[in-house]
Structure formats: structure tokens, C-alpha cells
């Protein structure tokens, strides 16, 4: 019998008490010879992306049992960023990532589980689970709940696709009729699943494919489609195979750190840049890499952003395409195949299927595959019926989107730009870098100069926008919203969406040491590092200061002399205990958030905790 981790609690006379407790959960003596596989679920009725996961843990557990393993399910917390948005609840979102990772470590190590299968979906849950996977480095597969279908409404007798961002945008527009706002509210999120655009949740689920830790189709196959059930069944069977191979044959090739290597992280970031994904993915990939002791930094991201083309625009960067359309065009595998054609990928990396990337693309690229089952899977589309139940429909597109000139995925020859949809800027405001989603910035705004209008909280900035105090040419500065200063690094979806509803999104810039929702577009620059609370120079900006932003040259610059900058630093330090703190902000910070703030590092380090011993 192989030496499973779980033998610590299942073998030997001295473990009679532990075995007695295991038996009380339904295990038998025969089960003690099998691998114990943790089914790490994240079901909650608070989140549409997780509302349908309750029974999916049971589905996977049954497959594990049939394949010769013992499944033991537990749950993590899951916060809905959309519901937590716009109030103090958003302070808790990013810190929950660390709690999720820690809770998984606690459960896995306390009970000596042999492997795990992670059922994730939304914003901080997938990153938290990935952090745990790299930290623990035991056999692991990711399977997500899948994206929801896009909403559809008719305006002027024409059907248009909508999503959550439309509900926020139209409700903030004083010119929108109440009936229209109500219609959009009722139609924006029609089914279970992660929101239908390429926001943080779907970006991260796509990246699990690129990292090699999930099955092809995981990031794009709709939650409502019957084909997604096949992914769950396949994942449940595969985790047992991988686990037994590791413990019986000492095959370490499919352990998380050997799959998600430095080369895999570079591939994942290249995918993210090519599809113009959420800027949050940068934050999370840095944190996940750190857990695996993988050398992956902002410098790598900066280098990739200058050579990886922008090949795909999905909502919120497009009003035409949503995740269902990305899937029809070949999804993650289709986009990776385009990057592979121009030699921008590391091909000799493995995935949970035990295949290298080149072989995987030969099988799953819709432009070249001969496999009818693969073609059929990528034809899986939306049915257009409201539901919170998964696997309820089997609609298929009449044909695939293979148009690489004007379709959802473009070839290099027809790229939106030769450098990608994300960029890292540096300058005296952000010595350690900051992030902008160029996919959401119009060409006219790639170079922008404006005067600062400074706020020390998101709430004050929102109030100023809604009261009409923001003018064309302003650079809105929202500081003390970083990991430490917030604390919790709030998302700035409401300020950016309100700017859009006021018609100012292409005439202003917004810079912050906070972060942005994956639904953000416009000239929105976040993750400024060091943050204000860590003595970053964003704390020194004054109203009316001139700020220069040059995305092609990767520069963000406060237009003052170096002598003036040094003087401002000196004056700030004279404030003693009040230096580098928000002076006028009133905000309750709970003990739990204070603990996170005490350990939190700036965004260029992934906003992870620096544990001091």
C-alpha cells in the first residue's frame, strides 16, 4: 500500500481514536487504504457565481468514490464583490483571499488530506484557492462554476447584450428612464454563474487553464450548459488518477508547483495581456507565485506587456462580446493558439491532463482540431432563460466563430494593438509601478495631461463626481485606499462607472493606490506602489498639481521639481504620528481589518502579508 499523507490518521494502533471518528463520517476499514481527497467547495447563497455549487460538490464526490478515492467535502467563505461594492463591505473583499487560503491550509493539514479538488468561481475565491494549492503542493485540480449567460434586452427593437456594469451605469445616469433602469436591473444577471464579462472572476478562471491547473474549457463554458457537467465528472475522476500516480509511483510532474512553474505564469500573464483581462489578475498572480516561491515579478509583467499583442476585446472592453462569445471563438485554447503561432508561449509545460501545451493546443484549437467532441463543446452557447440551476440547457451555436480578422479572437495580423491590453507604468508617483488596463483606454487618451483633484477616500470621490465637481481634464487622485491604508484595497468600480455615466470617462483620468473591478474601463490607473500609507509619493500630491500620463512610454509623472518633492517629503515627516495617514476621513476599521493592515504589503508584492517573526 502506498504511503498516503492520510495514513498519519488512518494507520497504526495509536490512531484507533482517529479511525473511530473517521468511521463516524461513513468511512470503512477498506476506505483507509484509499486516498482521502478534499472537495474544497465555496457554495453560498450570497453569490450568483456560487449559488449553484451546493450539489456540484456531491457530483464530484460521487465520481471520486467510483474511481477509488474517498471524498471529504468542506466549504470556504465567498464574498460577492458586486454586492460588497460601494460601501464598507468592500474593505473585506481582498483580505478574504488570505482567509480562504489559510482556511484551506488549516483543513488540509489538520486532517492530513492526500489531495484536493477546488470548486471556485468568483473574484477572491479562485485566487485564494490557488494560493493554497501552491502553498500545500499536493495533487490538485481546479473546476469553476462557470460564467453566467449575458443579459439581453430590446432597445429600439434591437437586441443588445448587457451585464452588471450596465445596471450600475444606467442607474447613475440621470437621463435614464426608470422603466429602462428597472428592465436592465432585472435582465443584467439572468442565470447562475460568474458575471458574464471578462471581469476578475472570469479572468482568473481563464488563467487556471493557462497555468495548467484546470481542464480546457473551464474558464468559458457556461454554468447553465450540460457540457459543464462533463467537466465536473472528468475532474472528479482525474484527481483520483493523479493522486494515485503521485503516491504509488512518486510521479511529481503533476504537483501544483511543477505544473504552475515560472514558464506557466509567464504564459498566463501573456494570455491576460492578450485578452485585456482584469488588472486584479496582476495582483493575484503575484500573490500566487509568492506562495510557490516562483520568481515572477512586476518586471516580468512589464516586459510581457511590451511584446504581447492585444487580440481580444470582451465586455467591459466591448459591447459586442461576452464570455459566451469568447467560448464560441475557441476560448482560452483559441487565444493561446494565436499566441503560440507567433512564438510567444513556453510550450514545454504540463497540465493536469498530463499533456504539454503544444499537444493540448493541437487537440483543442478550433482552427485545427479534427475532434468532433471538441468542436461540439465550443459550440455550447446560451439558452436565454433565467435560472439558478446548472446544466439545464443544451443549446449550441450553429457554427463556431473562426473569424480571426473581425471576430472575438483576432490573429496577430489583425490585432487591436501590437502591445497588450495591460501595462505597467513607472514614475515619481509610482516608483515600484502601477497598473492600467489599456484595453479600456481609447487611443486618444494613451497620452494624457491633467490637473489633480485629490481625495482621501473612495466615498468622497464618488460624492464629488455625483455633485458635478469633476471637470474635463481632471486627474482624480484617490489615495489611502491601498492594502494597508484602506485597509483592504477597495475596488473603484463606482467612481469609474459614474464617470462613464456622466460622459467624463474619456476626458478624465483616475489614479489610486486602490484597485479596480474587472468591470472598469477608461483611463483608470491603480495599484500605485508604494501606497500612500507606506510612504508612497501619491501621498504628496496636491490639488491642481500637473500629472503626466504616457502609456506608450510607460510613464506616470508628477510635474514638480525634485527639490519640491523632497520638501514635501520633509514636511510630511514633520507630522509625526499623523504622517502618511488620511487626516479628514471618518471610517470604522474593525480589529480583523486592522490585523490585515498590520501585515499587508503594497500591490507590487501582490498585497500579501509580510509575516514578521
From Swiss-Prot:
GO biological process, one term: isoleucine biosynthetic process
Database matches in InterPro entries: Dihydro-acid_dehy_C, DihydroxyA_deHydtase, DiOHA_6PGluconate_deHydtase_CS, ILV_EDD_C, ILV_EDD_N, IlvD/EDD_N
Signal peptide (UniProt feature, chain positions): none
Binding locations of [2Fe-2S] cluster: 122, 195
Pfam families tied to this protein: ILV_EDD_C, ILVD_EDD_N
Cofactor(s) the protein needs: [2Fe-2S] cluster; Mg(2+)
Disulfide bonds: none
Role played: Functions in the biosynthesis of branched-chain amino acids. Catalyzes the dehydration of (2R,3R)-2,3-dihydroxy-3-methylpentanoate (2,3-dihydroxy-3-methylvalerate) into 2-oxo-3-methylpentanoate (2-oxo-3-methylvalerate) and of (2R)-2,3-dihydroxy-3-methylbutanoate (2,3-dihydroxyisovalerate) into 2-oxo-3-methylbutanoate (2-oxoisovalerate), the penultimate precursor to L-isoleucine and L-valine, respectively.
Assembly and oligomerization: Homodimer.
Protein name stated in the entry: Dihydroxy-acid dehydratase
Organism: Buchnera aphidicola subsp. Melaphis rhois
Highest classification ranks of the organism: Bacteria, Pseudomonadati, Pseudomonadota, Gammaproteobacteria, Enterobacterales
